[in-house]
Amino acid sequence: ALLLDAAAQVGGDIISAGGTGTSDINTWASEIQAGTFLLGDTQYQRLDLPFRQAIFLECSILSKGDGYVVANAGLKALGMDHGDPRWPEGQVMFCSDEHTTLVPDAEQRIELDQRIRLVPAHLDPTVARHETMWLVDGTEVVDEFPVDLRHW
């Protein structure tokens, strides 16, 4: 109501408000400031919005133990303010500075040096920790984009 009152006082054709998380319920804004929908993160997947997650952190398996594996990506590579990343092939057990310990699902056969994809819980701070984003189609690299959010 406050924003609608301000728009009535100031005038103009555009009332810009909201974001990805309210894009499906905001009926009064004429422009939605939805940005995360493009790549998604686990927070928005929980809202059951009509967008599919399209960002992953690719990493490699460094070691194997009895019932667990360790990947070469941890707190320094992931935005952790919304919790642990998700791993579709199993469960995330623990994230340390540079590694993530994972428990594979029983049917998974994970090998050393195997590349896996972690699903970031929060997109923005994860992207800000990297210098390049890679656009892939399956396993093929299609393009790359520099990231200018580093060190923000």
What residues fall within each predicted segment?
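Internal helical hairpin/lid segments
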Residues: T36-P85
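Conserved active-site and cofactor/substrate-binding residues in soluble primary-metabolism enzymes
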Residues: L2-D5, Q53-F56, D97
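C-terminal accessory subdomain/extension
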Residues: K64-W152
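Residue-identity detector for glutamine
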Residues: Q9, Q33, Q43-Q45, Q53, ...
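Generic structural signal for short, flexible, solvent-exposed coil/loop and linker residues
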Residues: G21, T27-W28, R46, P50-F51, ...
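Active-site loop/helix belt of alpha/beta enzymes
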Residues: A1-L49
